[in-house]
């Protein structure tokens, strides 16, 4: 069952859900907690490689990703990040989220941004039980105009769903947790996938 606004507030107060920095009351509504854009981005560099063979060896995949992924782009608070039509970018939330082993989070982009063509998460919208860290956002501009994004803007919302019990393998306890404690716009670590 998803938590309502008063339950979210109580879970935050009791330290069951962790959010840093602590959210303001006006960022909690209905069944969601608003999240904001951080100032850390990465982009795929044009024409850096003809393709990435994601079925290749771990070493080949890692080398290809390193070749096409930009270094971190860290913006000052007053700078804008422009995402042009047809472009993909990674970004990070301002907030760091910590979930217990018996709760899953669900990230939704803002409808107002989608109506301008901005996809906030291309596919990954589940926040696993036991997660702790910032959330990497996978942006895609499917609209017709460039969009200027700034750190601190409201970018989406998270809802929280209580599970029937704690997971036996929460994210923070898994040895194969590729993005544990992430605090930047971490590039794909698909090369670390098991067999």
Curated annotation (Swiss-Prot):
GO terms for molecular function: dCTP deaminase activity; nucleotide binding. The active site is at residue 138. Gene3D superfamilies: 2.70.40.10. Its EC number is 3.5.4.13. Keywords: Hydrolase, Nucleotide metabolism, Nucleotide-binding. The keyword Hydrolase applies. Pfam families: DCD. Transmembrane segments: none annotated. This is dCTP deaminase. It comes from Idiomarina loihiensis (strain ATCC BAA-735 / DSM 15497 / L2-TR). The lineage of its organism: Bacteria, Pseudomonadati, Pseudomonadota, Gammaproteobacteria, Alteromonadales.
